[in-house]
């Protein structure tokens, strides 16, 4: 999770560690003019573009996978529970809960209102209008671009903890890449 530290500082906010704290920070980023330009023109949480996915198995720049993981929801994954039963993650109760929470973020305008419609999610990021985004390991390059484009102080933090106080993420098992040995 990448957050504008300068916006946190401007508003006197702490780094969010839980879902509720994330919602509080996103709301402040949308309603309290963190960039100080006197306009209501900031996006709390950036969403994926029209060529990306809300969640994905693999490459997912600006996707919302960490929000799903906060509820131990893993859409598009086949999961094995404690007794060995295989279940499809997209239809589990945890996914419904995650979708309801994400829907509320959208309804409350705390998440990108143009997500999945916008042609390029990087545009508002480079324009300095975004407070939080999620991305894979190579997001540091995006942050470097955004920093060069303005005064942004982006920092990487853990995504929100689940209600049980643990940190969850998704990772295929077994994990593999596209290398071959001949």
Task: Go through each PLM region and give its residues.
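Extracytoplasmic/secretory soluble proteins
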Residues: 1-182
């Amino acid at each position: 999770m990448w957050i504008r530290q300068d916006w946190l500082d401007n508003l006197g906010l702490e780094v969010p560690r839980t879902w509720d704290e994330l919602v509080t920070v996103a709301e402040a980023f949308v309603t309290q003019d963190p960039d100080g330009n006197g306009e209501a023109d900031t996006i709390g949480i950036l969403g994926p573009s029209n060529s990306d996915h809300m969640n994905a198995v693999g490459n997912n720049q600006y996707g919302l996978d960490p929000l799903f993981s906060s509820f131990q929801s893993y859409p598009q994954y086949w999961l094995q529970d404690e007794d060995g039963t295989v279940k499809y993650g997209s239809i589990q109760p945890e996914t419904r809960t995650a979708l309801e929470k994400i829907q509320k973020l959208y309804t409350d305008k705390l998440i990108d209102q143009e997500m999945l419609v916008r042609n390029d999610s990087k545009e508002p990021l480079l324009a300095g209008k975004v407070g939080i985004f999620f991305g894979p390991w190579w997001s540091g390059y995006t942050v470097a671009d955004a920093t060069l484009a303005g005064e942004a102080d982006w920092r990487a933090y853990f995504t929100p903890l689940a209600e049980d106080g643990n940190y969850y993420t998704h990772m295929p098992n077994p994990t593999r890449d596209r290398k071959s040995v001949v």
